[in-house]
């Protein structure tokens, strides 16, 4: 059963799933698609061609789907946001719609946890199980792989790609691509280590050991791309292959490796 406060504004044409709750003074635009069991809390705004998956929560004064902060954007362009299931979008977060420079949509996978005051700009592509801590900000066209965690107060430069399973420490500033399963820290961020906490949560000991050996082979000595090419030969671990292919395909470059004890 839907529960819609009398002061909420639901534009004609909005599609609302079963058991939706829309609280006081919330706004839902005409082209939106809201899934089942979604809660839109007081004062939140859902705009443009936005889809929000089942069992999601949009907290007070978050704005999802407003036009991109891109001077080349034209109002007549098809533009929107697609968010998967089980998303949590906390207070005052902003998620802008896409542009014609992408496919017109900013996309976020399932199980996203986007904390207060985060900003996700136009055309960003976020995988599943992403966590953005308070005030993390993503510029246009940023890509985050599955299971990535971005610490609070961390900006990420436009077009940067962060691989699967990475941890970006709080108050860092990221301007280059980060290899899957790595931990990055600093302003500008450098690669510090394998993300051992994240990998141990997801993989068995043998796979974590393979990733640890791969990290040492890739970063401790020699040319990074040559190391990646050599490591790919007869490589059986799919996760190690992901690391190597990412290095070989990077467009913005990989930041230098600095161990945990090096500033």
UniProtKB/Swiss-Prot annotation:
Pathway: Glycolipid biosynthesis; lipid IV(A) biosynthesis; lipid IV(A) from (3R)-3-hydroxytetradecanoyl-[acyl-carrier-protein] and UDP-N-acetyl-alpha-D-glucosamine: step 1/6. GO terms for molecular function: acyl-[acyl-carrier-protein]-UDP-N-acetylglucosamine O-acyltransferase activity. It comes from the Bacteria. Its main location: cytoplasm. Keywords: Acyltransferase, Cytoplasm, Lipid A biosynthesis, Lipid biosynthesis, Lipid metabolism, Repeat, Transferase. InterPro entries: Acetyltransf_C, Acetyltransf_C_sf, Hexapep, Hexapep_transf_CS, Lipid_A_LpxA, Trimer_LpxA-like_sf. The keyword Cytoplasm applies. Disulfide bonds: none annotated. PROSITE patterns: HEXAPEP_TRANSFERASES. PANTHER family: ACYL-[ACYL-CARRIER-PROTEIN]--UDP-N-ACETYLGLUCOSAMINE O-ACYLTRANSFERASE, ACYL-[ACYL-CARRIER-PROTEIN]--UDP-N-ACETYLGLUCOSAMINE O-ACYLTRANSFERASE, MITOCHONDRIAL-RELATED. Homotrimer. This is Acyl-[acyl-carrier-protein]--UDP-N-acetylglucosamine O-acyltransferase. It comes from Campylobacter jejuni subsp. jejuni serotype O:23/36 (strain 81-176).
